[in-house]
């Protein structure tokens, strides 16, 4: 099923803090640090140096960047291939060529002592196509050797085992013209769980079954990574990166079901997904003619076995019923990309070409439990196995320049040609040609105010598993597979306005509108249903966020961060013909946070609360709204110098957010047939105790 997160995914939960900074950037007679994107006396933007963050005792670049007033980190979108830049963080004036490491991971590996400065500039004014709005350029150096570590255990009193394995350690340094970085990271680990009652009612509202279910998960994702940078004298620079990762995911659910006229039953669900993946990436940039040429290569491979088993066993000893679904997928991606940049006609030009080859080879099996032998017996399931591949070629040309001292633009245009091939039971080959590009305008009407407008045409990446059939045993659903699935295309319109409030902080307004074609959702396929395309859909969002520094009011060291996100969407339901919102769409979000760094001490404390509301997910015969909340709140206390380390204790879920579900299943098409049953779930999560230790060596 398609999982649609917030349209305003560009807005990350704010944890930013006002700091003292130069609003005018570096003076013209000050040599720019190598890697700077602010060159010359006419450079516009804000510059933050390490002294601006001293009160927070940051351990790494992430700690520093999250304190910049009015700036929210936006990670790179999940795009086809490498494409043009989509995030809003640069590293020494360049964007990373890896797809596996998010911005958070890259920033946390850079010790705060290595950061020279942070430049907040207008993305459209840079010579990197795809950027718009506020962009942070992190200018840093490598020491001869430095290292850092963190450990973030967690404990819950209900249904969940303690988490003791979350943490990371990394080292980086420099030897002559070579910088190196090594890391071991298991931050993407978790222990989760919840338990409580579920009530099943019929169409008349009468209780027909009561359940008590408890579930918990274990997840660990250790990853070892290495990165080399060769930076000789001159205009050449090269990067080489690699990682290897194992992922271990286990889900266990045990339920006791009671229904009139039936023996009590015990239901168990067991899911296992133990995978591995690796990535090799590199780039080399050098001067050529009037400009510079950058060559990029990347190879990713992932082995992804998955098993789900569901058994319903009566306690009176009568025969149990059950099913098992398993699949083994092997995913590969190979990308080659070239970018040539040069100045001409008073602006910056770039021509780029990219070839990307994606593959999936998958084998699925379906079993049912034999009531006599108690063994799982395989059933025919040929539509779940097969291969999917896409060969894609892209060419783009971009041009950007300043129109006035306060107005700049960037124009990008091009197209892609792709061939989608499916093998197996429903083999099919199709080819597509799609134009794409963007126009960005940026205006700074006065100091402390910057506005940007971006219009973008893009093509979304497909999940190759959606081409093949799959069973979802927990709810008794299945996708029949769809060999005619097409990538979603969309026009995206984004407005961003940032205004400095001086010593009081800053505020930001974002407006987003998406006009989508071939929208990906669950649609009728043959006699069943599967992931497919809806001709038209749209969504809109308005986001207002602010950082308020209360130092001028006499509350030294106190700041408040707040954001409100309101969204709406629309499409014509492929089953009912009626208009509705997108499946699983986040239509509202609000967050407020308070942090107090106590002056003259190493102590800090804070509060945070957030609320989110989601639309239901839709299938042919059901609606399903699953959420946690309504409000998540946390409180923390932190000391920034415990034997040279930063130590934090935090209580999360302080106001008892619950795990909820409201699911209605119909006899036929929802809304056009009687209700078969309604499922109402209310499970306890309980408080979460989080502890963290961060240090360096």
Short names for language-model regions:
Residues 62-98, 123, 127, 132, ...:
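Extracytoplasmic beta-strand/coil segments of soluble accessory domains associated
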Residues 21-54, 74-76, 82-86:
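Short, acidic, small-residue-rich periplasmic hinge/interaction motif at the N-terminus
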Residues 159-194, 206-252, 272-288, 437-439:
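Transmembrane beta-barrel wall of Gram-negative outer-membrane proteins
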Residues 61-64, 103-106, 130-153, 165-167:
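N-terminal periplasmic accessory domains that precede
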Residues 639-697:
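C-terminal beta-signal and adjacent terminal beta-strands/loops
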Residues 95-122, 226:
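Short acidic/polar hinge/loop motifs at secondary-structure boundaries
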Residues 269-277, 329, 386-388, 430, ...:
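Outer-membrane beta-barrel signature, preferentially recognizing the C-terminal barrel domain
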Residues 511-515, 532-619:
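Gram-negative outer-membrane beta-barrel transporters
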């Amino acid at each position: 099923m398609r999982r649609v997160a917030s349209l305003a995914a560009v807005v990350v939960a704010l944890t930013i803090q006002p700091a003292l900074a130069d609003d005018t950037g570096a003076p013209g007679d000050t040599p720019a640090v190598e890697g700077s994107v602010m060159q010359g006396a006419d450079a516009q933007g804000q510059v933050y140096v390490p002294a601006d963050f001293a009160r927070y005792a940051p351990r790494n670049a992430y700690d520093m960047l999250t304190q910049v007033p009015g700036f929210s980190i936006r990670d790179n979108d999940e795009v086809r291939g490498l494409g043009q830049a989509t995030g809003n963080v640069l590293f020494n004036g360049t964007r990373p060529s890896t797809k596996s490491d998010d911005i958070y991971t890259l920033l946390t590996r850079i010790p705060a002592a290595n950061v020279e400065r942070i430049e907040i500039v207008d993305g459209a004014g840079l010579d990197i196509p795809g950027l718009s709005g506020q962009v942070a350029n992190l200018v840093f150096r490598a020491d001869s050797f430095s290292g850092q570590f963190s450990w973030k255990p967690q404990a819950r009193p209900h249904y969940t085992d303690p988490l003791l394995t979350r943490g990371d350690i990394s080292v980086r340094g420099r030897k002559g013209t070579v910088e190196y970085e090594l890391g071991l990271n298991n931050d993407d680990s978790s222990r989760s769980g919840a338990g409580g009652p579920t009530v099943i009612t019929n169409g008349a509202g009468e209780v027909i079954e009561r359940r008590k279910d408890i579930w918990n998960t274990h997840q660990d994702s250790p990853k070892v990574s290495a990165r080399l940078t060769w930076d000789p004298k001159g205009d050449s620079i090269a990067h080489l990166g690699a990682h290897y990762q194992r992922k271990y995911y286990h889900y266990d659910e045990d339920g006791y079901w009671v229904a009139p006229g039936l023996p009590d039953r015990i239901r168990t669900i067991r899911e296992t997904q133990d995978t591995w993946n690796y990535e090799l990436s590199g780039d080399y940039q050098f001067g050529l003619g009037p400009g510079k040429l950058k060559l990029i290569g990347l190879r990713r491979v992932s082995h992804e076995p998955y098993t789900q088993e569901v058994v319903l066993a009566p306690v009176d000893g009568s025969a149990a019923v059950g099913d098992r679904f398993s699949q083994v997928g092997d995913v590969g991606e190979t990308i080659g990309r070239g970018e040539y940049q040069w100045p001409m006609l008073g602006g910056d030009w770039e021509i780029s070409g990219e070839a990307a080859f994606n593959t999936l080879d998958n084998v699925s099996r379906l079993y049912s439990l034999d009531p006599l032998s108690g063994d799982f017996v395989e059933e025919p399931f040929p539509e779940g196995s097969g291969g999917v591949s896409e060969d894609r070629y892209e060419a783009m040309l971009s041009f950007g320049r300043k129109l006035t001292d306060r107005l700049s633009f960037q124009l990008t245009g091009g197209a892609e040609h792709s061939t989608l091939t499916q093998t197996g039971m429903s083999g099919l080959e199709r080819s597509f040609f799609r134009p794409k590009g963007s126009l960005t305008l940026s205006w700074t009407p006065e100091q402390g105010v910057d506005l940007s407008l971006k219009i973008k045409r893009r093509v979304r990446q497909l999940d190759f598993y959606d081409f093949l059939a799959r069973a979802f045993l927990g709810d008794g659903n299945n996708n029949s597979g769809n060999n005619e699935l097409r990538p979603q295309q969309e026009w995206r319109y984004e407005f961003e306005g940032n205004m400095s409030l001086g010593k009081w902080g800053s505020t930001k307004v974002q407006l987003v509108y998406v006009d989508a074609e071939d929208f990906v959702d669950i649609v009728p396929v043959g006699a069943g249903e599967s992931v497919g395309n809806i001709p038209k859909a749209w969504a809109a969002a308005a986001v207002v966020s602010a950082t308020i520094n209360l130092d001028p009011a006499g509350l030294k060291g106190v700041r408040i961060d707040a954001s409100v996100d309101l969204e709406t969407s629309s499409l014509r339901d492929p089953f009912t013909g009626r208009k509705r919102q997108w499946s699983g769409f986040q239509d509202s979000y609000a967050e407020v946070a308070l942090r107090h760094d106590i002056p003259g001490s190493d102590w800090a404390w804070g509060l945070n609360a957030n609320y989110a509301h989601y639309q239901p997910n839709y299938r042919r015969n059901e609606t399903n709204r699953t959420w946690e909340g309504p409000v998540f709140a946390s409180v923390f206390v932190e000391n920034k110098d415990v034997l040279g380390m930063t130590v934090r204790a935090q209580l999360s879920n302080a106001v008892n957010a619950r795990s909820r579900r409201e699911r209605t299943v119909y006899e036929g098409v929802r809304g056009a047939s009687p209700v078969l049953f309604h499922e109402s779930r209310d499970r306890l999560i309980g408080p979460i105790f989080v502890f963290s230790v961060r240090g360096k060596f």
